[in-house]
């Protein structure tokens, strides 16, 4: 069954609604963004979801083991921050995973203390082979649309045929233009390990609880 990450949350109430809907991860953005949160905001959201786990680094199996203990897990989204900043923020904010959404080198993953999702930007014309050649151990790849000047949350999809080709070889998180209306088809066609949404569950730039619930329900239905 595909896992669900609801990203860009800024309010404890929305995080609790995502948890009630059945989300597996909630994402808190520390990179420059209109969805950015402070450490204090993040800690309030994390504590609303329960006592944060002490989660050491690890891959898919480790993340799945953590989900047996607590759900949703709290993911901090960073872009081009150094390892010290990421680790310090993660500890202060009660994070359980980190997501690297900038142009970080893969070897940064070995310096981080938590499990990692690593954004891989997909341009028009990017092939399956190009993506696979760029992957390295140490993080779960999160495939997202490459939009100049944006770090995600753009609402723009990329070619799901390419995503499916990668997903046949590696567990991936699929992002980019997903909505309650199209995520079921995306899950059936790509068969990702997880899916990630931000703008697709917003109304006028604010998280919409009805859309969050509809998104999670669509993923569960398509994963049967």
Give residue ranges: language-model regions.
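Conserved N-terminal beta1-alpha1 strand-loop-helix module at the mouth
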Residues: 1-224
């Amino acid at each position: 069954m595909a896992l669900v990450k609801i990203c860009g949350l800024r309010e404890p109430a929305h995080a609790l609604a995502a948890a009630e809907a059945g989300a597996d991860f909630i994402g808190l953005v520390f990179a420059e963004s209109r969805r950015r949160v402070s450490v204090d905001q993040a800690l309030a959201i994390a504590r609303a979801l329960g006592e944060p786990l002490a989660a050491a680094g690890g891959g898919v199996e480790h993340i799945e083991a953590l989900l047996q203990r607590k759900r949703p897990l709290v993911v901090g989204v960073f872009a081009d921050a150094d390892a010290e900043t990421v680790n310090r923020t993660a500890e202060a904010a009660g994070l359980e995973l980190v997501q690297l959404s900038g142009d970080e080198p893969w070897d940064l993953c070995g310096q981080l203390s938590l499990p990692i999702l690593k954004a891989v930007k997909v341009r028009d014309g990017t092939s399956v082979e190009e993506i696979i050649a760029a992957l390295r151990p140490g993080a779960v790849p999160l495939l997202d649309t490459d939009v100049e000047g944006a770090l995600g949350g753009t609402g723009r999809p990329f070619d799901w045929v390419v995503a499916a080709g990668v997903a046949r070889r590696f567990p991936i998180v699929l992002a980019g233009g997903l909505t309650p209306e199209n995520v079921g088809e995306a899950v059936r066609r790509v068969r990702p390990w997880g899916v990630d949404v931000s703008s697709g569950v917003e109304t006028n730039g604010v998280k919409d609880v009805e859309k969050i619930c509809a998104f999670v329900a669509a993923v569960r239905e398509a994963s049967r």
